[in-house]
Amino acid sequence: MSRSAPLLLNPISAISGTVNVPGSKSLSNRALLLAAVANGETHLTNLLDSEDIRHMLKALTQLGVNYRLSDDKTECWVQGLGRGFSVDNLETLFLGNAGTAMRPLCAVLATSIGEFELTGEPRMEERPIGALVDSLRQAGAQITYLKNEGYPPLKMKGMALKGGNISVEGAVSSQFLTALLMAAPLFEHDSVINIVGELVSKPYIDITLNTMAQFGITVENNNYQSFTVKGNQQYQAAGDFLVEGDASSASYFLAAGAIKGGTVRVTGVGKKSIQGDIRFADVLEKMGAKITWGDDYIEVTGAPLTAVDMDMNHIPDAAMTIATTALFAEGTTSIRNIYNWRVKETDRLAAMACELRKVGAEVIEGQDYITITPPNTLIQTDIDTYDDHRVAMCFSLVALSDTPVTINDPDCTAKTFPDYFTRLKQISA
């Protein structure tokens, strides 16, 4: 894979301004898939234009879905099929490294008609999918692994799945449950999905349930221990569907304001958001920043920051931003219960620990936690980004010190936020 040229970020002396964050990746791909199988036309606005979304759109084209994109690719009119997918010949879908496309598509295709292969980039072949496949097999799915047991690529023969009692592992990724929930209304009979172990990233399940409701399907949530879904249902087009701004993407700008002492307002997300990652602002507040909430914005004003010791299982993506914010906080910051960092775009616990040490931090990397003690002065270094958009964006915050930083392969942010560095520059002095 070709890499983009390294980007040198010189020290930023001041931060202030307003940023409208692009649409949420989680919401964009969920809404596209449900719009595709719904009855009628859905008009999506503020859709994210990024690699992960393009992989989903290309797959939907291969699966016979008609849609129209606006010139700036942030509006999409999807003509729903009114049913699961149906293909005559084997369709091979390449999904890059998009977990939000791979997992839900796997579940919906298992209960569609035809033969499908799901493939992706080399890293996708290291991201587990076994827990989802096991659950789908309980419902009657025919899925085989083409390389390694428990990992993509996969081949499946779609068929009518019966539903019934299904158990799913909750501890590795909430995307397995999300995928099952989205597919379950298409099963022949009612389903009771039982969670085995602790369910991680519960707020992402709330996003799924909220999105399903906008497409006419309600799910009985039994305190996140089990979920009851009626079978043989049809999704209904949502009409106009506004994709909220991405709360994980907002975290970098909010952190920048907190660190540098200016005032930064992020629009597109606010107190009415359905995304759990807005709770990132609460962590900044606990560290000492001043937070103001509006319906459609979050505003932060910086102040001297102090370290925190917190369970951040509920905000796994935004918690990464706390790891670099910790470089500017007094004391030792501990981020706990984040095992699922290890099964994301890269092993994020190992990657963050390695790069934080390069800038001079004292780091302890546990199996499911990380502690960070900042140095007196950050060290100028080149940050490796591991083809992980969030690593690149997190370490851009180093430039808020008196130390320049070089970000290797900065274009990896294209996965969720192609013009991130341009937006950061717009609020920097």
Curated annotation (Swiss-Prot):
The active site is at residue 317. Its EC number is 2.5.1.19. It comes from Pseudoalteromonas atlantica (strain T6c / ATCC BAA-1087). The keyword tRNA processing does not apply. Keywords: Amino-acid biosynthesis, Aromatic amino acid biosynthesis, Cytoplasm, Transferase. It is an enzyme of class 2 (transferase). Monomer. It is found in: Cytoplasm. This is 3-phosphoshikimate 1-carboxyvinyltransferase. Catalyzes the transfer of the enolpyruvyl moiety of phosphoenolpyruvate (PEP) to the 5-hydroxyl of shikimate-3-phosphate (S3P) to produce enolpyruvyl shikimate-3-phosphate and inorganic phosphate. Phosphoenolpyruvate binds at residues 25, 99, 127, 175, 348, 390, 415. Pathway: Metabolic intermediate biosynthesis; chorismate biosynthesis; chorismate from D-erythrose 4-phosphate and phosphoenolpyruvate: step 6/7. GO terms for cellular component: cytoplasm. 3-phosphoshikimate binds at residues 25-26, 30, 173-175, 201, 317, 340, 344. Belongs to the EPSP synthase family. Gene3D superfamilies: Enolpyruvate transferase domain. One of its GO terms (biological process) is amino acid biosynthetic process. The keyword Transferase applies. It catalyses: 3-phosphoshikimate + phosphoenolpyruvate = 5-O-(1-carboxyvinyl)-3-phosphoshikimate + phosphate. InterPro entries: Enolpyruvate_Tfrase_dom, Enolpyruvate_Tfrase_sf, EPSP_synthase, EPSP_synthase_CS, RNA3'P_cycl/enolpyr_Trfase_a/b. GO terms for molecular function: 3-phosphoshikimate 1-carboxyvinyltransferase activity.
